[in-house]
Amino acid sequence: GPCSLESQENCKEVLDALYPIMKGKDWYFKGSFDKANRTSIHSDRGPGIHKGLDIFAWIKATYPSVKLVTDIHEPWQAEKLSGYIDMIQIPAFLCRQTDLVIACAKWFKHINVKKGQWLSPQAMEHVVTKIKEVNPKAKVYITERGTSFGYSGLMPDFRAVDIMKSFSDGVFLDCTHSTQKPKGETTGGDRELAKKYALAAKIFEYDGVFIETHPDPTNAISDADSQVELEWIVSQINNI
């Protein structure tokens, strides 16, 4: 799905394209209600939690069987989101925040943790342990979203897949955020490289992929350089 929910109309355009072709596949529609870590204080952060919940409710009512995933930023949000979201996602920058991790473990059965860009794959076992100690029945997944490569680059470490599989319930590759180039007033990216990561993920035996897609990426309110065109996803879904 899109980086930000942006609007109900934008979500409808994405879902109208994906819903028919994703039947029979294990997939989640992703959209963020709040882009809480924007580079600039003036950047659009999205609809916010209250309007976001309305959009999530509309999706559930309009597209039966669609599962939802969104990111959380503060512990109090867990309870509010639990009635709408099938899998909660902990952002990479927040993956060591114990109160947030515990809140997710208390309210969700499926938790996707983005690996911090500065952390070794082995260090993620501590995050998984926190969740499992609070909720032993929770399914905990780890998403590789790139490791810091110099001051303004990220590079996925394909060696980490088997390491993180050994203590989690699955490992995903974030194809789009792994191409980000944190710099200046905006965060850059490389959607063409993201497409190559998506096609290569199965070679490294990831359990799944995380891909942000948008009908008009260059005009998206966030991650305009890394989101993949919706038509590309439609054309390549059976190759991913």
Please tell me what each predicted stretch does.
Residues 83-84, 204:
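Structural motif
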Residues 28-30, 69, 89, 112, ...:
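Conserved beta-strand positions in the central sheet of alpha/beta enzyme cores
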Residues 4, 92-94, 197, 201-223:
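Glycine-rich phosphate-binding active-site loops on the catalytic face of alpha/beta enzymes
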Residues 2-10, 27-49, 213-224:
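Glycine-rich, proline-tolerant flexible connector loops at the mouths of alpha/beta enzymes
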Residues 108-213:
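Catalytic alpha/beta core domains of metabolic enzymes, predominantly
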Residues 17-23, 44-69, 103-110, 161-172, ...:
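Alpha-helix-loop-beta-strand connector modules within alpha/beta enzyme cores
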Residues 4-17, 47-54, 188-196:
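Glycine-rich anion/phosphate-binding loops
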Residues 47-48, 63-77, 86-100, 109-121, ...:
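Catalytic beta/alpha-barrel core
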